[in-house]
């Protein structure tokens, strides 16, 4: 049975991020780079979008955390990802995988399955992506899921156990698991799906939240990342007229989040 996450835990992890300002190495897709950087800055992290293969390994070794997203994958980016992940592992830098459209396109699916063997600290995806990586039948529409998040809870648990990662399957309700315990986050707003990048940015926020976090606390950290994004989205949508006004309102609400607003949203 999924558990709710106490608001105090979310607030504690958010305060830790703002205090520590984790250097977050982001290798993401071309569509969302700027938005992702702004989301991280609004929350208090320090994004660095280092993508050159000549630099990615060196930077992953000194970063607080690495976030990998395969959304607009090319062979050159795949090489960069492999270099960065190997360097991160050698340096003890935790890293997060966002397996965009895994299970839909063979090339990226093969790369994601290869990366599963490289010990990601967390995996964040939609239901279809998580089900595909867990070896279950899934229905995806390009980068979008044709499965509901609750349909992927079992797959997320299987994937968490096989990979050793915390797995977050996101949708109308987010489910986060370490293979045994399952936490659910019910917040957010449908307007979040009408702008590009909220899911991809979430994966980098997950990375920032696990930076400097003890392994035993990673489940709560990942769930807290999902919670702050959902809460900010919900609050922004309440005042936005549409996608155009939603984005700046969303960034503002990430910046303004505090223990009181978190408690109100999760009450």
From Swiss-Prot:
Protein EC: 2.7.1.50
EC primary class: transferase
Alphabetized Pfam families for the sequence: HK (PF02110)
InterPro entries: Hyethyz_kinase (IPR000417), Ribokinase-like (IPR029056)
Organism superkingdom: Bacteria
A Gene Ontology molecular function term of the record: hydroxyethylthiazole kinase activity
Keywords carried by this UniProt record: ATP-binding, Kinase, Magnesium, Metal-binding, Nucleotide-binding, Thiamine biosynthesis, Transferase
Catalytic activity reported: 5-(2-hydroxyethyl)-4-methylthiazole + ATP = 4-methyl-5-(2-phosphooxyethyl)-thiazole + ADP + H(+)
Pathway: Cofactor biosynthesis; thiamine diphosphate biosynthesis; 4-methyl-5-(2-phosphoethyl)-thiazole from 5-(2-hydroxyethyl)-4-methylthiazole: step 1/1
Cofactor(s) listed in the protein's UniProt record: Mg(2+)
GO-annotated biological processes: thiamine biosynthetic process; thiamine diphosphate biosynthetic process
Gene3D superfamilies: 3.40.1190.20
Residues annotated for substrate binding in this entry: 49, 197
SUPFAM superfamilies, A to Z: Ribokinase-like
Positions that bind ATP: 124, 170
Family of this protein: Belongs to the Thz kinase family.
Protein task: Catalyzes the phosphorylation of the hydroxyl group of 4-methyl-5-beta-hydroxyethylthiazole (THZ).
Protein name: Hydroxyethylthiazole kinase
Taxonomic placement: Bacteria, Pseudomonadati, Pseudomonadota, Gammaproteobacteria, Aeromonadales
